[in-house]
Amino acid sequence: LLGVVVGVVAFFIVSLSMERIESPHFSAQLSAARLMASSIAELSTFRESLGIEIDPSVDPNLTGLIGPEFTELTTTLGNLQAKRTSTNPDFAALLVKYFEELDLKKGDPVAIGASGSFPALLLATLCACEVLELEPLVIYSVGASEHGATHPEFTFVTMLERLVDVGLLKDSLIAVSLGGNYDTASGMFFPGARELMTEIALSSGKTFIYEEPLQAS
C-alpha cells in the first residue's frame, strides 16, 4: 500500500512539474490536419454519392481512401494496416514540420511523384502545401498496391478533381503515368488492365507519360 501511495504522490509531483511546449509550427500543423480531415470527409461523402460502397471491414473509419484488394489497377501486394494508418490527418501536420525544417517559403515549388498506393499520404502532402502556400507539382501513376486507390472510378485523379471543385485544394496535377512494372503497366494481374489504366490517364487531361525505357519515363 505504501508503494502505491508513494507512486501516486510521485506521479502527482511529476505532473505538476511538466511544462507544455508548443511546436513552433503548431498553428500551420493544426490547419493542415484540419484541412485533411475536411478533405477526407468530403471524399467519403462523394465516393458514396457515386455509388461506390465503403467496406467498413476494410475501412473502419469510412474514409473512402482505402480501395479494394484486387482490381485492374492493383500492381503489387500491400499492407492493409499501413493503408489505414496513413489516413490519420496528423500526417498532414507531420508534412508541415518537414517542410518547415527544409525552410521552404511561400511560392516554393514542391515536386511530388506518387502512385495510387497511398492516396492518403499524397493528400496529406497536398494539404501541407496548401496551408504553407507552396506550389506542389504532382506526377501521378495510376497503378496502386492492394487497398490503395484501386477502384477504377475513384483514383486520386478523381479525388483531386473533387477537392478542387469544392475549393479545398488547388489543381496541382501536371502529368499522369500508368505505373506498375517499368511504369508501363506491364505484367498486370487482369487482362485489359493496361488499356483501362491508359484510359484513366488520358481522361485526366494532363500530360500522359509513357516511355518504354524506364529512365526516359
What are these regions (language model features)?
Residues 1-16:
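Hydrophobic membrane-insertion alpha-helices, especially the h-region
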Residues 18-32:
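Ser/Thr/Pro/Gly-rich low-complexity linker/stalk segments immediately outside membranes or between
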Residues 31-90:
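N-terminal, Lys/Arg-enriched amphipathic/low-complexity engagement segments
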Residues 79, 83, 113, 205-209:
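Conserved short-loop catalytic and cofactor-binding motifs
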Residues 90, 99-102, 106-155:
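Membrane-embedded segments
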Residues 95-99, 217:
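Generic hydrophobic alpha-helical segments
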Residues 155-217:
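A substrate-binding/cap region within the structured catalytic cores of diverse enzymes
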